[in-house]
Curated annotation (Swiss-Prot):
Pfam families: Ariadne, IBR, IBR_1
Chain segments carrying region Ariadne domain: 358-492
Domain free text: Members of the RBR family are atypical E3 ligases. They interact with the E2 conjugating enzyme UBE2L3 and function like HECT-type E3 enzymes: they bind E2s via the first RING-type zinc finger, but require an obligate trans-thiolation step during the ubiquitin transfer, requiring a conserved active site Cys residue in the second RING-type zinc finger. The active site probably forms a thioester intermediate with ubiquitin taken from the active-site cysteine of the E2 before ultimately transferring it to a Lys residue on the substrate.
Regulation: Autoinhibited by the ariadne domain, which masks the second RING-type zinc finger that contains the active site and inhibits the E3 activity. Inhibition is relieved upon binding to neddylated cullin-RING ubiquitin ligase complexes, which activate the E3 ligase activity of ARIH1.
Gene from which the chain derives: Arih2
Protein name: E3 ubiquitin-protein ligase ARIH2
Region (Disordered): 1-37
Length: 492
């Protein structure tokens, strides 16, 4: 939260929010079980302790390159021994079936020949087309070569060593690992690594090939993910692959295990991809909403937002208002935190295509503006965190307490960032959500979370005006709101 460039804020009006307050224009709905749930949510926040169930709890392990390689090697040697195949072929089979050994063994017992066909290490007898070229003839360079210089996979499509070398070298230079396949048209067979390595002309290419193979092995493994951090060699291992938050213990990168993108709960992986693509396509929208200034709705003075809190106070007239909707903050909380909920036009389906297009744009802008606003608030609150850190250092240096005495201030700023990050990703979720009782429940929880986050942000930015107990109580409420929303809606 902030005001004009020279202003400081004062205490907020922190009123309780009435979940049953609805706009008069909206149709009256039978609340049914939802109203009971609203009451339950409010009581849950007060009853749950700090050790309450965390819906984001997720067990994972960070592995080094050597540890990952060792785990992969163990799977490979075990499978090769059971199936009586080479280590290279065993790896191709494992890649094709995402390293799920039990499934591979079941398929092998059921139909071993079909397993090898599906893994692309043996040709399909019903579809295999043998070479039509004369003996000792390379089908690529069209040259006659000595028999010992002709090489082929299990498909028996023969090509000269020189053509194989060029084929493999070009693909490795292009970043291909496991994906190197037979040169014959429409032949799906993949080349085992023990076939490729002797064909690479120098150690530099062989080193690249090893890296690409390792990358492909990890990416195909259902329990492993490469850390997306810059130049980070770590691998994350889990027991159950899900769209959950993981953090590398080497570079501290935080990401979604399932899609390796920025963590995005409660929005699922497919939805966040759609949303980010849409935002990128509508780049002009970002320019339209990029302004950091708005006019005070009471005295019209230009106000700059240089803090994360959306509770604004004009330095000139002391009017308290919401940055997002410009509504009076005194009544803001009593109106179901309305500015977080989009009011759709129920008659839009009966209107013209142009009207529907305008409504679609209006809806998108509503959600995008809030998404972008919370992103900016996170950046501004990161600066607040640094100021708190510096202030604590100054107090400790002046013998005004120890780090332990003031640690709660940093904890509050960290929790604020955690809660606001979750809130930011509720907007893509709501944008794509179908209208109905479940969306109304989601919007209620979203509004409750947003209200408590703004209360926490206000207090963090004015920590000297609040005692420790008040701040920690607000932290507890905000975190429980966040956990309640994720428990009910982060189900991927």
């Amino acid at each position: 939260m902030s005001v004009d460039m020279n202003s400081q804020g004062s205490d907020s009006n922190e009123e309780d929010y009435d979940p049953n307050c609805e706009e008069e224009e909206e149709e009256e709905e039978d609340p049914g079980d939802i109203e009971d749930y609203y009451v339950g949510v409010a009581s849950d926040v007060e009853q749950q302790g700090a050790d309450a169930f965390d819906p984001e709890e997720y067990q994972f392990t960070c592995l080094t390159y050597k540890e990952s390689e060792g785990a992969l090697h163990e799977h490979m040697t075990s499978l090769a021994s059971v199936l009586k195949v080479s280590h290279s072929v065993a790896k191709l089979i494992l890649v094709n079936f995402h390293w799920q050994v039990s499934e591979i063994l079941d398929r092998y017992r059921s139909n071993s020949a079909q397993l090898l066909v599906e893994a692309r290490v043996q040709p399909n007898p019903s579809k295999h087309v043998p070479t039509a070229h004369p003996p000792h003839h390379c089908a690529v360079c069209m040259q006659f070569v000595r028999k010992e210089n002709l090489l082929s996979l299990a498909c028996q499509h023969q090509f000269c060593r020189s053509c194989w070398e060029q084929h493999c070298s070009v693909l490795v230079k292009d970043g291909v690992g496991v994906g190197i396949s037979c040169m014959a048209q429409d032949c799906p067979l993949r080349t085992p690594e023990d076939f490729v390595f002797p064909l690479l002309p120098n150690e530099e290419l062989r080193d690249k090939y090893r890296r690409y193979l390792f990358r492909d092995y990890v990416e195909s493994h259902f329990q492993l993910q490469l850390c997306p951090g810059a130049d980070c060699p770590m691998v994350i291992r889990v027991q159950e692959p899900r769209a959950r938050r993981v953090q590398c213990n080497r570079c501290s990168e935080v990401f979604c295990f399932k899609c390796r993108q920025m963590y995005h709960a409660p929005t699922d992986c497919a939805t966040i991809r759609k949303w980010l693509t849409k935002c990128a396509d509508d780049s002009e929208t970002a320019n339209y909403i990029s302004a950091h200034t708005k006019d005070c709705p009471k005295c019209n003075i230009c106000i700059e937002k240089n803090g994360g809190c959306n509770h604004m106070q004009c330095s000139k007239c002391k009017h308290d208002f919401c940055w997002m909707c410009l509504g009076d903050w005194k009544t803001h909380g009593s109106e179901y935190y309305e500015c977080s909920r989009y009011k759709e036009n129920p008659d839009i389906v009966n209107q013209s295509q142009q009207a529907q297009a305008r409504e679609a744009l209006k809806k998108y802008l509503f959600y995008f503006e809030r998404w972008e606003n919370h992103n900016k608030s996170l950046q501004l609150e990161a600066q607040t965190y640094e100021r708190i850190h510096e202030k604590i250092q100054e107090r400790v240096m002046n013998n005004l307490g120890t780090w332990i005495d003031w640690q709660y201030l940093q904890n509050a700023a960290k929790l604020l960032a955690k809660c606001r990050y979750t809130l930011q990703y509720t907007y893509p979720y709501a944008y794509y959500m179908e209208s109905g009782p479940r969306k109304k429940l989601f919007e209620y929880q979203q509004a409750q979370l947003e209200a408590e986050i703004e209360n926490l942000s206000w207090k963090v930015e004015r920590a000297d005006s609040y005692d420790r107990g008040d701040l920690e109580n607000q932290m507890h409420i905000a975190e429980q709101r966040r956990r309640t929303l994720l428990k009910d809606f982060h189900d991927t």
